[in-house]
Amino acid sequence: MWFKNLLTYRLTQEVPFEPEALEAALASKPARPCASQELTTYGFVAPFGKGEDAPLVHVSGEYLLIAARKEERILPSSVVNDAVKEKVEEIETEQMRKVYKKERDQIKDEIIQAFLPRAFIRRSMIFAAIAPRLGVILVNSASAKRAEDLLSTLREVMGSLPVRPATVKVAPVATMTDWVKSQQAAEGFHVLDECELRDTAEDGGIVRCKRQDLTGEEIQLHLSTGKVVTQLALAWQDKLSFILDDKMVIKRLKFEELLQEQAEQDGGDEAAQQFDASFQLMMMTFAEFLPVLFEALGGEEIPQGV
């Protein structure tokens, strides 16, 4: 269990995440298939294992892991629009009258309902790790919308979930731009060979650099003309590499081989033990990494009450 993306959410109040109570709460909204006339369903699933006996909360030391699954019927808009157009033309030709918006919308709804049972189904899972002592929920996603879907559903079953995205005191753009300009990142961090530069002017240009020396004259020239760094590839110690963006999203997160080998040694041969060992080691790494990252970005803005 290694996260590939990371969104960090800060609990603004202390929440007693008791595993048994959380298990019962998640069980009140299990994932289920879409009914024939449903566009989408959303609910919780076991993060590891299958079957009714698989727990919805994976407990590893002080850390908890949960997962949710979204199931949705895929109706291509072009297919629906073509069917609506064909039906409207048929009515206007046969009845010699114009079809206006209200009737067109009704036709569209009827066509969607007729097509739904035959639509393809797409399933997607999302994981979240809860670290009560650290006061954070970590979501394995680069999409704020997907993360908010999970958190709002968790809030629904728990009754309350005081949480907000983690923020820092200095805009990440300013810090990343300074690191590339000065050719020196904060202690423990190393700038790699990929970045995105944007012009600060409205509708300004975008430059994406890959496998490029970011200390070179070309990059410095872009920065001197007013562009800023909005995404930056970084490495931390000998443990992690990742892309950091201007919204504090961590993407393409990669745990270095030494960590993965350690998890394999700790986990042994059983799949369940391997899963638990990698999750535990990942969370211990995050517990060390996130405070250092926040400090490097100017310090975390801690909400009142925390």
Curated annotation (Swiss-Prot):
A GO CC term attached to the entry: cytoplasm
Entries under InterPro entries matching the protein: RdgC
UniProt protein name: Recombination-associated protein RdgC
Pfam families per UniProt: RdgC
Compartment(s) of residence: Cytoplasm, Nucleoid
The organism's place on the tree of life at top rank: Bacteria
Keywords of this entry: Cytoplasm, DNA recombination
